[in-house]
Amino acid sequence: MARFDGKVVLVTGAGSGIGRAISLAFAGEGSRVVVADVDVNTGEETAHALTEIGAEAVFLQADVGKEEQVKAMVHKAVATYGYLDCACNNAGIAGTMARVADCTEENWDRTIGINLKGVWLCMKHEILQMLKQGHGVIVNTSSAAGLVGLQGWSPYVASKHGVIGLTRSAALEYAKANIRVNAVCPSIIKTGMAQCFTGGDQRVEAYILGQQALNRMGTPEEVAAAVLWLCSEEASFVTGHALAVDGGLLAH
């Protein structure tokens, strides 16, 4: 019997990268997966990939920065499968590179709006459902940049620090309701977003990788494995934790 047989899992930002890997990993362990993404094409591709391996999956389009869409997403997920065991709030963007004094209000608002407000909105409506059913697990995607500073990416760094703060607060607020809340904090992972940070410059990439003790990029599947562990009964005594999946970056 797989760890997640019959479990219902919601994954945002599931159309590509880490979100897609999380969806595939849950599907491979027996979950019914609600694939959520703002991009219809990539979201439907992920849902199709899950059904191709014999999993139950449904795609829901949602902009996580808009409450009515998030509320509808959670409602439709529960209407489809009856309940919500796990939620992985993974949708996010890199935003535009900017130092604090150079950042535009538009860049700040967009990055915070998706990466931080979006996670809060998802948590809000997921928790309301989990309170009704008496249990649940949430894993939010933060970043290694949520644990340290990073020059030139102030909106992104602020948003990811905020995700960890939300995670810890919610973990304390809802522990007695049998709801666990954790975060996963990847460093540079082999996804399209990595290009946003390196600009495709091999020298920049080499420098970043040199800061990671394992001297390579992580894979989406490695992050997904950490997420599944946090959602599993194996991590039943873990809540309020920010788990770095960083190749040793933060060991320095």
For each feature predicted by the language model, list its residue ranges.
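Short C-terminal tail/terminal secondary-structure segment
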Residues: 94-97, 148, 228, 239-252
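C-terminal helical subdomain
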Residues: 183-186, 203-238, 247
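Canonical Rossmann dinucleotide-binding motif of NAD(H)/NADP(H)-dependent dehydrogenases/reductases
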Residues: 2-34
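Active-site helix of classical SDR
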Residues: 123, 159, 167
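Short, small/polar-rich loop/turn modules that mediate ligand/substrate recognition or access, typified
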Residues: 175, 180, 238-240
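Residue(s) in the substrate-gating loop at a strand-loop-helix junction
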Residues: 143
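Substrate-binding pocket helix/loop in short-chain dehydrogenase/reductase
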Residues: 98-100, 104-112, 208
